[in-house]
A protein has these predicted regions:
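Glycine-rich anion-binding surface patch
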Residues: 2-267
């Protein structure tokens, strides 16, 4: 492989108007072959997340890494590593960010790319179009909320009406633009979280970290309306998890494959 500086020459310091320029490690390639070489180089790094690594640990059915007889970890090749790195590198060049930062904040969930919520907030704050995001939290008091409860029985998906009583917190993400105009997201509420099925999912952080989840969701809603060029049509990791069927039918476990990156729900 040629010298890294030749493979990925530094991008000029003038970044796109919608993003903040990075002062270290932003790379740009000039043709497809250079991009492939750069992606291959990045996939060999131990600093990139699992989805982008050429070699990943083999795990048993309990999620524990397996080892060889000599104690070294068992590894298997990830066939998607180079292509994932290539996509991340392309997005980094388009957005004016360092590829490693994109990889650390772009997750693959159920086959879909998703931004970390912290990255969405940071990108909005750094884009230069607005003042830093603010969050307005209001407690509307205890409320009994009806929702549709779905479940599987004899291979069929059924549903019934159920209720849950909770403190109905609401959140609006807002800021002002350079002209002083107030811009705000739609109101996100715990009632919405229940009715949309986010709250009652197994392991849902809406039950234990309501304030944080409200802020994350409000920021994502704000970004899609007022800064779509930053999100590029990609949802937050929290949203993608919540969009997955709340009650999927269980299926037999298949042979071990390279697993998608496992990340906590409060990213």
């Amino acid at each position: 492989m040629s010298n890294l500086a030749e493979v990925m020459p530094a991008m000029p310091m003038q970044a796109p108007a919608t993003t903040a320029p990075s002062s270290n490690g932003v790379f740009q390639v000039t043709n497809f072959n250079e991009a492939i070489n750069a992606a291959s180089f990045l996939s060999g790094s131990s600093l990139v997340p699992t989805d982008y690594r050429r070699w990943v640990p083999v795990k048993n059915q309990y999620g524990k890494a397996m080892t060889n007889a000599d104690g070294t970890p068992q590894l298997m090749e990830n066939p998607n590593a180079t292509s994932n790195c290539l996509i991340a590198l392309n997005m980094a060049n388009r957005m004016g960010y360092d590829p490693l930062m994109i990889m650390q904040n772009l997750y693959i969930i159920e086959g879909r790319p998703a931004w970390s919520s912290q990255f969405i907030i940071a990108a909005i704050n750094a884009c230069g179009k607005f003042d830093p995001l603010q969050f307005e939290i209001v407690n509307e008091g205890e409320k009994e909320i009806e929702y549709v409860n779905s479940y599987w029985e004899n291979g069929k998906k059924l549903s019934n009406q159920a209720t849950v009583k909770l403190e109905n917190l609401t959140c609006i993400a807002w800021t002002t633009d350079k002209k002083g105009n107030r811009l705000q997201s739609d109101k996100i509420s715990m009632e919405m979280a229940v009715k949309e099925g986010w709250y009652q999912k197994n392991g849902s952080k809406w039950q234990t970290m309501a304030g944080q989840m409200l802020r994350y969701r409000a920021a994502a809603f704000f970004g899609r309306i007022y800064a779509p060029e930053i999100l590029m049509g990609i949802y937050s990791a929290d949203e993608v998890r919540d969009f997955v069927d709340v009650t999927p039918e269980t299926a037999p476990q298949q042979a071990a494959q390279p697993k998608q990156q496992q990340i906590p729900c409060y990213d």
